[in-house]
Amino acid sequence: MKKIALFSLIILVGGCREIAGERVKGSGHVITENRTASGFNNVDISGAIDVYVKQDSVSSVKVEADDNILEYIQVHSDGSTLEIYTENNIRLKPTNKIKVYISNPQYKEIQVSGASTIRCENEITSADAIDIGLSGASDGRLELNAPKISVHLTGASNTSIKGKTKDFEGSASGASEIRGFDLLSENANVDASGASHIEIFASVKIDGQSSGASSVNYKGNAQSSVEKSGASSVNKKD
């Protein structure tokens, strides 16, 4: 009797695990679907998605994926933040990477996580500050123009960034990397930790810190007061 009960328990637990981790394999028929969203200034992406962001006069969201996977890709807007994510407990195996194309007149904050990528299809300009966050081995290629730009990376994420700003604030931790020589900033504040790397251009001043086995490389004629500790480094590049 005990053996039967134990066997039944194993079957039950195994079944629960299978349900909790349902796997959906792409059909191979990739299509594009329009989703309804408007009135947002912030974007929050998670779940191994390739995101293409464009500044345009009209708001739109298009999702490209296998036809049997589209239903598991959620798009919601609460009036200020557009959220795009894959359903919990569903393991998707798309034929190709899931792609999302976003157009909007204005962007203030973009958060990307879970091995997702973000690409700017044109230069994103703003009269206000722009805040970018990447985590969980995410990747970015950014083109921004705003009075203040903040970029924060964690968890082995990396991004390249170009454009123009007066004040740049950048942090990288957990073996992350910011490549920002092509972002023309006047003032820069940086924080590199945990074997991370930051590259930045600054024409007036640059401050902050570099710790652990991290490095900060900068171009421009900025006065530097970046503090370093441990095996970290701070270097001016030509």
What role is predicted for each listed range?
Residues 2-9:
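Sec-dependent signal peptide hydrophobic core
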Residues 33-34, 40-53, 100-102, 106-238:
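Extended, compositionally simple hydrophobic/Ser/Thr-rich segments
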Residues 73-75:
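Solvent-exposed adhesion/ligand-recognition segments of exported proteins
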Residues 78-79:
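Short acidic-glycine loop/turn motifs at beta-strand connectors
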Residues 85-88, 201:
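Generic short beta-strand segments
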